UniProtKB/Swiss-Prot annotation:
It comes from Meleagris gallopavo (Wild turkey). GO terms for molecular function: calcium ion binding. The keyword Translocase does not apply. This is Troponin C, skeletal muscle. Ca(2+) 4 binds at residues 142, 144, 146, 148, 153. The lineage of its organism: Eukaryota, Metazoa, Chordata, Craniata, Vertebrata. It comes from the Eukaryota. Troponin is the central regulatory protein of striated muscle contraction. Tn consists of three components: Tn-I which is the inhibitor of actomyosin ATPase, Tn-T which contains the binding site for tropomyosin and Tn-C. The binding of calcium to Tn-C abolishes the inhibitory action of Tn on actin filaments. Keywords: Calcium, Metal-binding, Muscle protein, Repeat.
Amino acid sequence: PSMTDQQAEARAFLSEEMIAEFKAAFDMFDADGGGDISTKELGTVMRMLGQNPTKEELDAIIEEVDEDGSGTIDFEEFLVMMVRQMKEDAKGKSEEELANCFRIFDKNADGFIDIEELGEILRATGEHVTEEEIEDLMKDSDKNNDGRIDFDEFLKMMEGVQ
C-alpha cells in the first residue's frame, strides 16, 4: 500500500530505532498478526511508549486516525499519530525546560551557544548531521549575525525544530 505524505513525513521524523521500538509495542497488541490494532488498545500502547494522552485526546486521535471508522489502525497510521503526540508534547515543553537545555549546552556559561556547542546539541539528538547542516542552522538561527545564538534565538530555533 502506498504511503500518504503524512505517513512518509512521520517516518522521516523518527529514527530507525524509534520505529523499531514502536513496532515492537504495536505488535504486542496486534494479536492476530493482521497488521492492525484495535483503537481500544491505543491508549495502552501509547502509554507504554511514554505518551500520556487524556481520554479526550485519545478520542480525538482515534477519530482522526481511524479515517475509515474500522475501529482499527494500522502501523503507518499509528506512526503518524505517535509523531503528532510527540510534537504536541514537545510544544508543551515550557521555556523553563528549554532554559535548562540552553544552560546545559552553553558549556562555557557565557550566555551564548556557539557553533561548536550547536554541533554537540545536534549530535546529542542522535541525528546524523553534516558540518554544512550545522552551519546552515547556525546562520538561520543567529538573527543578529554575531556568530552565536543567544537565548531568544535559541527559543526561536527550537520552535522551528518542532
